[in-house]
Amino acid sequence: MQWEVVIGLEIHTQLTTRSKIFSGSSTQFGSEPNTQASLIDLGMPGVLPVLNQEAVRMAVMFGLAIDAEIGQHNVFARKNYFYPDLPKGYQISQMELPIVGKGHLDIALEDGTVKRVGITRAHLEEDAGKSLHEEFSGATGIDLNRAGTPLLEIVSEPDMRSAKEAVAYVKAIHALVRYLGICDGNMAEGSLRCDCNVSIRPKGQAEFGTRCEIKNVNSFRFIEKAINSEIQRQIDLIEDGGKVIQQTRLYDPNKDETRPMRSKEEANDYRYFPDPDLLPVVIEDSFLNDVRATLPELPPQKRERFQSAFGLSAYDANVLATSREQADYFEKVASIGGDAKLAANWVMVELGSLLNKQNLDIEDSPVSAEQLGGMLQRIKDNTISGKIAKVVFEAMANGEGSADEIIEKCGLKQVTDTGAISAVLDEMLAANAEQVEQYRAADEAKRGKMFGFFVGQAMKASKGKANPQQVNELLKSKLEG
């Protein structure tokens, strides 16, 4: 039987506010346990939550970016459940009236096509604390620093049909929230976490199968592996005559399998009701307009502009627009260097390789956009060749100065004097007289391969400084003369 996979995702994004959603406690990551939890975060009697307006602004900004309905009258609700790291015994969230309603996001797939994924809603809520199992023997520690940190939970429609589509969607959300500046996207620190809802059904069937939720997956690679593992588990189970039970599961990367955590709850299990300590949130039109005016150029528009204004391919535009920092870096290099396609190649290939080797983000690049743009100017005006440029780039990465300083100090200027190049070629051809005779006696097909040998010898003789184009032209003339 052929199976169709149905995937919907819930993405929890930690908002980059300096204080928590209902208290003035700091949201800074990495502090000593339980040093950033106020009486409000601890749920002490007699204290009242106060909504952080900046969290509201960030949620509205996200809603506008996905062309969603904004809930101008939205309500906070209590989600009631017991867990050791939830001090109040309930979580303040939103249920019936969320701040962001239906919207959509267009995602770029590996084959170059674009798919629209529906977004059901996005709502504000507070994060729970954190249980610490490894640090204690025979016990569990509780760190409440994270309790009360503002989250925007983004709930997709079940529109994805493969693990790769799901990863593409998460990457698009990751890029968007970073572009907007509302989440740092640091998955290792838990700033962006994903719950994956997975089910299968016979191909052509309209009714959904029974879904299982994989909780708290925190890397793109694990999202793909967890979903594929769960798909195979469900297929094997049904084909062996079993039945999928609705449940919450965890992904074990060491065994590459999902394992049951608990039976899957429904909304009524949480006994949602409006939080009596918080008034309904009313968003005025003027507030909406103010937020709309601060929206930056978003990834889809940036990709489109990179193709139309710079003549880049869809692939190159997509790669360069992955993050706001990378897009800004590329544009600065292109404006200084004067050649967008050359800039794109250097940013994606040479710079990308350098950053990967050193495990750096582009904002921490040892080669600034100004330095790289300056070096591309020297390629454009024939001061250096593309081959010598790699030597200059490596020197810049090692902190040896600007391109001009390195070229001058190391004597790397390209030789463009026709007479000087001609003399080098004459000497090289004389030293390879036998190969010259073979070339002249060969047919056209063999000459092509042999010509490359002479070019290599010429560049070697000039220590890579001879202008390659002039070498080709003069060499052809001498060999066929």
From Swiss-Prot:
Keywords, in A-Z order: ATP-binding, Ligase, Nucleotide-binding, Protein biosynthesis
Q: What class of enzyme is it?
A: ligase
Record-listed E.C. numbers: 6.3.5.-
- What is annotated about its quaternary structure and interactions? Heterotrimer of A, B and C subunits.
To which protein family does this belong? Belongs to the GatB/GatE family. GatB subfamily.
Q: GO terms for biological process? A: glutaminyl-tRNAGln biosynthesis via transamidation; translation
Keyword set includes Iron-sulfur: no
Tell me, what does this protein do in biology?
A: Allows the formation of correctly charged Asn-tRNA(Asn) or Gln-tRNA(Gln) through the transamidation of misacylated Asp-tRNA(Asn) or Glu-tRNA(Gln) in organisms which lack either or both of asparaginyl-tRNA or glutaminyl-tRNA synthetases. The reaction takes place in the presence of glutamine and ATP through an activated phospho-Asp-tRNA(Asn) or phospho-Glu-tRNA(Gln).
UniProt entry tagged with the keyword Ligase: yes
Q: What is this protein called?
A: Aspartyl/glutamyl-tRNA(Asn/Gln) amidotransferase subunit B
What species is this protein from? Answer: Pseudomonas fluorescens (strain Pf0-1)
Q: Quote the catalytic activity from the record.
A: L-glutamyl-tRNA(Gln) + L-glutamine + ATP + H2O = L-glutaminyl-tRNA(Gln) + L-glutamate + ADP + phosphate + H(+); L-aspartyl-tRNA(Asn) + L-glutamine + ATP + H2O = L-asparaginyl-tRNA(Asn) + L-glutamate + ADP + phosphate + 2 H(+)
GO terms assigned for molecular function:
asparaginyl-tRNA synthase (glutamine-hydrolyzing) activity; ATP binding; glutaminyl-tRNA synthase (glutamine-hydrolyzing) activity
